Amino acid sequence: MGRRGRGGGGGMGGGINRRYLSQVMDTCGKDLSTAEDIVDDLRSRYGNFARLTRQVLLLNVRQVLNVRNNKRVKDEDEDDNIGDEEGSASQRKKQRRVDEKEEKLQRAEQSHLRKRNMERSVSSSPSSSSSSEDSGDVSTSEDAVYGEKLSPPRFDLINDSLRDNYAKLNSSSKKPIGSPAEKNVEVETVSNKGRSKLATMGARKEAKVSLSLSGATGNGDLEVEGTKGPTFKDFGGIKKILDELEMNVLFPILNPEPFKKIGVKPPSGILFHGPPGCGKTKLANAIANEAGVPFYKISATEVISGVSGASEENIRELFSKAYRTAPSIVFIDEIDAIGSKRENQQREMEKRIVTQLLTCMDGPGNKGDKNAPDSSAGFVLVIGATNRPDALDPALRRSGRFETEIALTAPDEDARAEILSVVAQKLRLEGPFDKKRIARLTPGFVGADLESVAYLAGRKAIKRILDSRKSEQSGDGEDDKSWLRMPWPEEELEKLFVKMSDFEEAVNLVQASLTREGFSIVPDVKWDDVGGLDHLRLQFNRYIVRPIKKPDIYKAFGVDLETGFLLYGPPGCGKTLIAKAAANEAGANFMHIKGAELLNKYVGESELAIRTLFQRARTCAPCVIFFDEVDALTTSRGKEGAWVVERLLNQFLVELDGGERRNVYVIGATNRPDVVDPAFLRPGRFGNLLYVPLPNADERASILKAIARKKPIDPSVDLDGIAKNNCEGFSGADLAHLVQKATFQAVEEMIGSSESSEDDVTDITQCTIKTRHFEQALSLVSPSVNKQQRRHYDALSTKLQESVGRNTEQVTIGPSFTLE
């Protein structure tokens, strides 16, 4: 048994020798017809087989039976063919020679077709096609293959279906993608799991065609259909950008002759950058539709592959198709995914992808390479889109690649009004549409947000009709959802209109995109809510509001008013309120930074936060940045503890320089101007120092009335008398606290009287704040700024005026105050 594994016939699973098993199976009875019966018999008679598992033994028995059956069938076939072989020996020799010759011909044909298909797929020049290819005739004879005439085989043994496949393959390789009449087309190739869609419309052909072609990243279906998509007329608020694109992009594509004549190279790349939702992708599609050239659209993440080298090959394939169909446009969305800075990349594959992208953008390759596409037919315009332009590799942003950068910033109030005009064209409006009002209610909204507002306004209009249908439904209670299935008669459809109120409600349902980018919602604080302060209002109108609303006039005179304001004074005087009112009046984007929220414990992160803050503000200019409690970031250098913010302070000074601001207006507020570094107080940074003192008697009365405007004040209450006679030294915050305490006293009194009475019903209309409630509140509230602090701030204002010698004039009319 130990030598069984070396027996003839080869070993099998379980240590069983095939020859031995076959001999043992011969001893079984003839009545055992199945493998299962043979296994049971062997296990019952032989102990070594009983020790094996039934499954292993059954597998080996079946293999032996299969070998026997195959041998039997082969022997029968040989017996049947003995006579035929003896009678046709010479014929078989001749047949063999014919088969060898035909096989050689087939291999040569296949090699020839593969070579020709490869040449057709690489070459884009019309001259590369022969006259026979232009006519659609394809030669597959041995003359075309070998260059000499060969005698045909005696018997044509090649499969007819195989010949048909060869002919179809060759004819499809000769078939051009589009005729010259259809060359002015838009082609959209969208790579999605190896599938590519190519949208094409000929100049004279409107019928839809479907064919198969390899896509940008692999083989896929190619759909050719009519051009559909956005155009330049679908945009609002970016007229200057559209004019620039028409001159620098569309004109070179549609009229290349002037550029060739004068020897000027057309633009090779455009980089769109801006916050999400501002229309970067839509604008790229509009360029392709306006130009009418092949358009290859791909997301950057679709290029990346897990196989080494496949990502680079996908990029080469994409640009190869673009250069073969030049002039064409390649659009790479979210290009920062494959074009990030190489020094920050951790993996070599990511660095190779960036390098391959740089190489492909430089041109179609080596002109000496016969397989390289010919770029003489035109050029390829590469468009990239990203909301992180600083993350791109610097080599991508040099001349010859993305040489033109267009910032699609968040729209201002006038631009939002133009966008709303475009969006409202598709809506069925009732009555006049006040686009200026909606634009004023939507600070920080981008184009996508305004489209969402229009969509939600339409839903509000439909819901209004649905609510009326619900109320008119019969109250039988059988089916309370029958209104969902009720048909819409024509008279009810005619009632569907979008009203102005629908837009106003929809605005509150959409979150501004800029709030996700670090911007703040522009506060709903108007100058009417800030009584007095005529001097401050004049300053803000002169240096912030008017330059934002009428920039052309200031630019014509060469006036540079990009200066900063530093509001200082006792706490609670309304410095923050004034800044919010100025931002609201200007209608610009608004960023509210609260003190030390930019500080970070990690080295370099605080400076990065400052750079990012101003970069976002410049991207979405005009923008107002308000630094509340700015003294936390501007502590004088050299003092104790100043080293914590020293690096941040230096970066802050650089960003505040007028040359770097570019329509970014800065307002700071502090109650400790003495600790601010003097470098911040020079012109061009916080150039205007405005002192906001405590209000006088008349101003206190104005503030108290503004605060009590939304409170149920009893008509018998003398607010003027309370403010002038009982609130000496009160700041705006103290007066707001006083009204709150009086309101709380009135509420407590009303609740106590309702609990003590037998009748639980309370008349809400009789709930008012009376004089006794204010008297009770006055006993609980005291001024937050004492006389010594007032003298300190007055002396500090005089000192700053003498040391700086600029606009530090004390405001003689104190601020009004209102609840936010």
Curated annotation (Swiss-Prot):
Transmembrane segments: none
Residues forming coiled coils: 85-122
Region of interest (Disordered), residue spans: 72-157, 169-188
Entry GO terms, CC: cytoskeleton; nucleus; phragmoplast
Stretches with biased composition (Acidic residues): 76-87
Gene Ontology terms describing biological process: cell division; protein transport
Protein name as annotated: Cell division control protein 48 homolog C
